[in-house]
Amino acid sequence: MAVWALGINHSTAPLDLRGRFAFALDQIAPRLQGLRQSLSSHPGVETAMLSTCNRTEIYCAAEQAAIDHTLGWLAHSGGVSTALLRAHSYTLQDSRAARHAFRVASGLDSMVLGEAQILGQMKDAVRAAETAGVLGSTLNQLFQRSFAVAKEVRSSTEIGAHSISMAAAAVRLAGQLFEDLSQIRVLFVGAGAMIALCATHFAAKNPLGLALANRTLERGEQLAARFGATVLRLADLPERLHEFDAVISCTASSLPIIGLGAVERALKKRRHRPMFMVDLAVPRDIEPEVKALGDVYLYTVDDLASVVQTGQASRQAAVAQAEAIIDAGVQSFMHWLAQRNPVGGVVPLIRQLNAQTEVWRASEIARAKKLLAKGEAPDAVLDALARGLTQKMLHGTMAELRAGDADMRAQTAQTVARLFLRAQSNHDL
């Protein structure tokens, strides 16, 4: 059984395609259970799913045939052809899959180099797989080692130093459009972690006003209270949109919530004063046609990439250090995996040896109990038990010593001496 990572990310797939595969956290466990049912002809497969704004990945411990099926299942889930998904996806096996997982956890594969949020998202993915009952010992080991590597990378390097977050990038872009951010009104749509971070950055600029719209009013009020923002109902957005100079949106909606018509009406009421809009959602919150409007400056999560990547060149030394830590982690994991390989692996052999010796032990114990029940002397019974175990353990070895040609017997003799006469050799020393 091999370890696999397959999926799409910001480097391989455009925003709209990624949007088809953006699954909310509470959707992941049910989808993994559905995947397991579709893999019923491949028993023992382990799976986990990571879904963020910038990537959707499935990690598997499985054979090749199960991976081919999984890619088709994922394509069907997103409503696209397998050929289209394959053209924009990657499928990585064993050491490449482990390296990818370690790089993702460490923030090296993120749009924002060194960002820490992905580590928490990976831990959420593990919990979802556990809830679905599809994680398994192999993937659990992969993820636990991913977390350990990520911790070492962050504590031993400066990979996250001086990075620019998406939220900070949004503020920087707004500053290029508006001369004074303290003279604008800002609307946030959504109440998740990304909106909270954006609100923190914009609030630091002391704008004229902050407002927040959310589908769940209570949750919106809780976040708004932290920044002194007013709260709007999501249904009121079309009629209130013109009041705001900047709109930052990031919800989990499967469909756009700010349409072209609403923005056109807002611009008319604003007498075509410019509007700054940032859509951090995947799939989109704001209809893409809005970008064509002359007085709107609309940025998506992909548009912010060039801003957040500023300064990454100066952190290449930290990247090199991180890659060295990851290299060591990959080697360690692959050694662990090889030991558990059914063909030639140490762990399966140890299990077989333990099972065989347990059969011998049980057989000799049963024989000893019968002898004791017949009134045999305990010393004689113990001697027979020990002799019986010794004969069973050495029978195969003795047969191998007599088999084969002279060279083979000599090699076998060296191995047997190393295994069975080690204690005697140490005693002689």
Curated annotation (Swiss-Prot):
The active site is at residue 53. GO terms for molecular function: glutamyl-tRNA reductase activity; NADP binding. NADP(+) binds at residues 190-195. Keywords: NADP, Oxidoreductase, Porphyrin biosynthesis. The keyword NADP applies. Pfam families: GlutR_dimer, GlutR_N, Shikimate_DH. Substrate binds at residues 52-55, 110, 115-117, 121. It catalyses: (S)-4-amino-5-oxopentanoate + tRNA(Glu) + NADP(+) = L-glutamyl-tRNA(Glu) + NADPH + H(+). Its EC number is 1.2.1.70. Pathway: Porphyrin-containing compound metabolism; protoporphyrin-IX biosynthesis; 5-aminolevulinate from L-glutamyl-tRNA(Glu): step 1/2. Possesses an unusual extended V-shaped dimeric structure with each monomer consisting of three distinct domains arranged along a curved 'spinal' alpha-helix. The N-terminal catalytic domain specifically recognizes the glutamate moiety of the substrate. The second domain is the NADPH-binding domain, and the third C-terminal domain is responsible for dimerization. Homodimer. During catalysis, the active site Cys acts as a nucleophile attacking the alpha-carbonyl group of tRNA-bound glutamate with the formation of a thioester intermediate between enzyme and glutamate, and the concomitant release of tRNA(Glu). The thioester intermediate is finally reduced by direct hydride transfer from NADPH, to form the product GSA. PANTHER family: GLUTAMYL-TRNA REDUCTASE. NCBIfam families: hemA. Catalyzes the NADPH-dependent reduction of glutamyl-tRNA(Glu) to glutamate 1-semialdehyde (GSA). Belongs to the glutamyl-tRNA reductase family. This is Glutamyl-tRNA reductase. It comes from Verminephrobacter eiseniae (strain EF01-2). The gene is hemA.
